[in-house]
């Protein structure tokens, strides 16, 4: 009996790696004088996959930096999508280029000079292109990008979004790949809305103003943020994803209404007074664009941003209010111009959509009157095309729809060209 069991053990085959015999595993694969079981194969596969992901992340980072477009190439790309704002585009092109070159220096980990991070503050009216510029940059660089509304943020422990949710949104954009998130861009809109109520420290708690600024300081400067995996809530027993925000580029933006008045007061206080004062110069009203271009950190402090917060945003650039001509160009010229978008939409119904020059000028004028900038253009066009977009899918034999100034000005019905050269107007209320 004992001899039989010895013979059986000798006839069994064993995994050369874990030592389990063929009866203890599902599969045992034989090689020249070596065996490997299915469990060891899975373990090896997991190790290789993990190493490959790590290597791919490093390679991906290096590739992004090695193939980084030059500043003039970045600006040229921005020109294709954003009309005007040439100075701001130049500032952003240089800032983004330097930021990602800095990462290359950081990854080399040499004993050379350590380069600081330069986050950006964009100041400009509604619809001037702040968000579009940031989105276009992120697409060009192929990095994760997220937009957060500063008005939804509160200090930790209060009702509202914790500031670390900003990083969680960025992680969601890249499927919780931490290395990719650490190369991303965070755009915080409406940053002017978290200004404290006065430039004097308040004894009452300002959880959605100065409190949020304080909470954002470390995040923007660079810290190790602990983020719950897969968007879960924080609790002490769980493991957190550690995200280093030192290499994340933060772009903050806002309209900063009334900031021009603060700048104007400062400039007026610096002018000569008394009999030698230049009365003519004093009477001249300076434009808002001119005043904002003279903005200094002290003006932003008076507005309600704390000095430490301004210090984390060393690059400040101003976007001009868009003129009527600029809005006309926005409607027609960029790659994703609104007119082109609606023409493509109508092409899906095999119908050509045409706007004459006068109608486009009137649409731009309406946006100027509404003080909505480029952001208001889409809602104006939607209103103009509502009836025809409602009727069109049910109509047949339509070849072309013509939009002229009367359609824009008095909301009259557009002209319809039928396939058999019949001309009718769209039905509508």
UniProtKB/Swiss-Prot annotation:
Keywords: ATP-binding, Chaperone, Metal-binding, Nucleotide-binding, Zinc. GO terms for biological process: cell division; proteolysis involved in protein catabolic process. ATP binds at residues 125-132. SUPFAM superfamilies: Glucocorticoid receptor-like (DNA-binding domain), P-loop containing nucleoside triphosphate hydrolases. CDD domains: RecA-like_ClpX. Residues 2-56 form the ClpX-type ZB domain. Gene3D superfamilies: 1.10.8.60, ClpX chaperone, C4-type zinc finger domain (6.20.220.10), P-loop containing nucleotide triphosphate hydrolases (3.40.50.300). Zn(2+) binds at residues 15, 18, 37, 40. NCBIfam families: clpX, PRK05342.1. ATP-dependent specificity component of the Clp protease. It directs the protease to specific substrates. Can perform chaperone functions in the absence of ClpP. This is ATP-dependent Clp protease ATP-binding subunit ClpX. The gene is clpX.
């Amino acid at each position: 009996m004992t001899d039989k069991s010895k013979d059986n053990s000798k006839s069994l085959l064993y995994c050369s790696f874990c030592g389990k015999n063929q009866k203890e595993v599902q599969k045992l694969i034989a090689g020249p004088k070596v065996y490997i079981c299915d469990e060891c194969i899975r373990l090896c596969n997991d190790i290789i996959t993990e190493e490959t992901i790590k290597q791919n992340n490093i390679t991906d980072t290096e590739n992004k930096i090695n193939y980084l477009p030059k500043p003039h190439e970045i600006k040229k790309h921005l020109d294709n999508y954003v009309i005007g704002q040439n100075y701001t585009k130049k500032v952003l092109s240089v800032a983004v280029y330097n930021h990602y070159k800095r990462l290359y220096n950081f990854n080399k980990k040499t004993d050379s000079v350590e380069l600081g991070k330069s986050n950006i503050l964009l100041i400009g009216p509604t619809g001037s292109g702040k968000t579009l510029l940031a989105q276009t940059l992120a697409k060009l660089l192929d990095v994760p990008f997220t937009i957060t509304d500063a008005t939804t943020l509160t200090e930790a422990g209060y009702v509202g979004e914790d500031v670390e949710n900003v990083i969680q949104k960025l992680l969601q954009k890249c499927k919780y790949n931490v290395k990719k998130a650490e190369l991303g861009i965070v755009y915080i809109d409406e940053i002017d809305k978290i200004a404290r109520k006065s430039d004097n420290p308040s004894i009452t708690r300002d959880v959605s103003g100065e409190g949020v600024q304080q909470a954002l300081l470390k995040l923007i400067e660079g810290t190790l943020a602990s983020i719950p995996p897969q968007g879960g809530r924080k609790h002490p027993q769980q493991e957190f994803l550690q995200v280093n925000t030192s290499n994340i580029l933060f772009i903050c933006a806002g309209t900063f209404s009334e900031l021009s008045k603060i700048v104007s007061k400062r400039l007026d206080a610096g002018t000569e007074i008394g009999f030698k004062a230049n009365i003519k110069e004093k009477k001249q009203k300076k434009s808002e664009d001119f005043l904002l271009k003279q903005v200094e950190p002290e003006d932003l402090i008076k507005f309600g941003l704390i000095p430490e917060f301004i210090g984390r945003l060393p690059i400040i650039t101003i976007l001009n209010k868009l003129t009527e001509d600029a809005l006309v160009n926005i409607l027609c010229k960029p790659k994703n111009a609104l007119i082109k978008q609606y023409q493509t939409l109508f092409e899906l119904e095999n119908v050509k959509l045409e706007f004459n020059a006068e109608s486009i000028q009137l649409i731009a004028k309406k946006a100027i009157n509404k003080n909505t900038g480029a952001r208001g253009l889409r809602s104006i066009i939607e209103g103009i095309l509502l009836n025809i977009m409602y009727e069109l899918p049910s109509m047949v034999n339509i070849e072309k729809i013509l939009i002229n100034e009367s359609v824009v000005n008095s909301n009259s019905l557009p002209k319809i060209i039928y396939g058999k050269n019949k001309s009718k107007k769209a039905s509508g209320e």
